[in-house]
């Protein structure tokens, strides 16, 4: 079985490095992007198993990556991570097709969600 690759799209480099390190130490490959445009390009050109994106501020800027991901690769699960729970953004993300919406810095929940998706066969 190939190593699943997570596409991380975070505005803040510190968050990107933190979550990337957690994923790599848990056996995942990572592709890290600091902009929506870079994330969408990676979706279009690389073999991505799951997308993990920052909600962004003040509006749900990650929406662009979520929508584009589901258009290009509807089989790839998308997990949204937010600094604080915003019920409007949560409902929008779930309505658009995100598999989950977690508050930072809940790293253990992120790994639990990824492991659950792997067991379900989402990482083909």
Predicted regions and their residues:
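Conserved phosphotransfer cores of two-component systems
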Residues: 44-46, 68-75, 96
